[in-house]
Amino acid sequence: MTERTLVLIKPDGVQRRLVGEILGRIERKGLTLAALELKTVDDELARRHYAEHEGKPFFGSLLEFITSGPVVAAIVEGPRAIAAFRQIAGGTDPVEKATPGTIRADLALVTQDNLVHGSDSPESAAREIDLWFPGR
């Protein structure tokens, strides 16, 4: 069964010119890029995307980071796309929790600036895809 997930290449990944490397890893895994856009994230979209973190101590810095530069947003499809992308992304802490060979372990150093976001469940994927790609 084909599944869809939202993948974001965050401002640090775009700024460091890692978009091609990251998209290549997604495609080499066997996943399909069904939609792809370079976006400027405004405060409203950032707040809606990270609504679950509102009230947490890091919420402000999270919003500041995601709005600090362009983001590549993608709808990624394939069998078990959510789990497959999260596997190649690696743990959120790129130094202590990400497995070598993953995007974060190989290319990132700081937890907040960890290059990519991927939906964590089918429900999150549906909500996030609707936010970033309305009507898709």
From Swiss-Prot:
Phylogenetic classification of the source organism: Bacteria, Bacillati, Actinomycetota, Actinomycetes, Mycobacteriales
Protein name in the entry: Nucleoside diphosphate kinase
Keywords from the named record: ATP-binding, Cytoplasm, Kinase, Magnesium, Metal-binding, Nucleotide metabolism, Nucleotide-binding, Phosphoprotein, Transferase
Cell compartment(s), UniProt: Cytoplasm
Reactions accelerated catalytically: a 2'-deoxyribonucleoside 5'-diphosphate + ATP = a 2'-deoxyribonucleoside 5'-triphosphate + ADP; a ribonucleoside 5'-diphosphate + ATP = a ribonucleoside 5'-triphosphate + ADP
Similarity-based family: Belongs to the NDK family.
GO biological process: CTP biosynthetic process; GTP biosynthetic process; UTP biosynthetic process
InterPro entries: NDK-like_dom, NDK-like_dom_sf, Nucleoside_diP_kinase, Nucleoside_diP_kinase_AS
Active site: H117
Source species of the chain: Mycobacterium sp. (strain MCS)
Gene of this entry: ndk
Gene3D superfamilies named among the record's database cross-references: Nucleoside diphosphate kinase-like domain
Keyword Phosphoprotein set for record: yes
Enzyme Commission number, as recorded: 2.7.4.6
